Regions:
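Glycine-rich, Arg-bearing micro-motifs that act as flexible, cationic patches
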Residues: 102-125, 139-142
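An anion/phosphate-binding loop that grips the pyrophosphate of nucleotide cofactors and donors
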Residues: 97, 126
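Short helix-capping segments at alpha-helix termini
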Residues: 68-74
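Short, surface-exposed alpha-helical segments at coil->helix boundaries
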Residues: 54-65
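Short, glycine-/small-residue-rich phosphate/pyrophosphate-handling segment
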Residues: 130, 135-162
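Short acidic active-site motifs
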Residues: 85-90, 117-118
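Small/aliphatic-rich secondary-structure junction motif
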Residues: 2-52, 77, 152-162
Length: 162
């Protein structure tokens, strides 16, 4: 069976509460709808984090969903707080998924034009397609358009596909 086919089609998105990850969540929700896939929203905490960090992670996931889609998501979605390193965990969670969507800055402190080490790792190690939603600060006009009810989470130039 091809990745992402059958009754458990999935689109995975990593969120951390940043504008870029919220744009990634909107993009992932749109893509899940277009693909008739289940949406999996992942927030990663360090492996040794305590229960309070996990509870905060679920609060952040709920906030991200409310912020990204004030009227609610139109697809079934699974929210998950996972433990580990963000990049490795997102690649593991995306195994067999049709798409992994992540947010990233266009320029990072690491010198990577598409963001930090999470982006680089996901692009290098994910088996499927990776979609990158880049620097949302540069797209304030788009945010205003969304507030006016027009769609679009990420500009097309911000996509990275493996």
């Amino acid at each position: 069976m091809q990745p992402g086919t059958g009754p458990r089609r999935r689109v995975v998105v990593g969120v951390d509460g940043t504008p870029n990850s919220l744009a990634a969540l909107r993009r992932a929700a749109d893509q899940a709808g277009q693909r008739d896939a289940r949406l999996e929203i992942v927030y990663v905490i360090p492996a040794g984090a305590n229960g309070a960090a996990e509870a905060s992670g679920y609060e952040m996931l709920n906030m991200a969903v409310r912020h990204a889609s004030p009227r609610g998501l139109d697809r079934p979605a699974d929210s998950l707080v996972a433990r580990g390193k963000a990049a490795e965990t997102l690649v593991q969670r995306s195994a067999g998924a049709e798409l992994l969507v992540i947010g990233a800055r266009i320029h990072s402190g690491y010198g990577n034009l598409l963001g930090g080490d999470v982006v680089s790792y996901c692009l290098s190690h994910a088996r499927g397609t990776v979609d990158i939603c880049a620097d949302q600060r540069a797209h304030a006009a788009q945010a205003a358009a969304q507030a006016a009810g027009r769609s679009g989470a990420c500009p097309p130039r911000s996509q990275g596909v493996k």
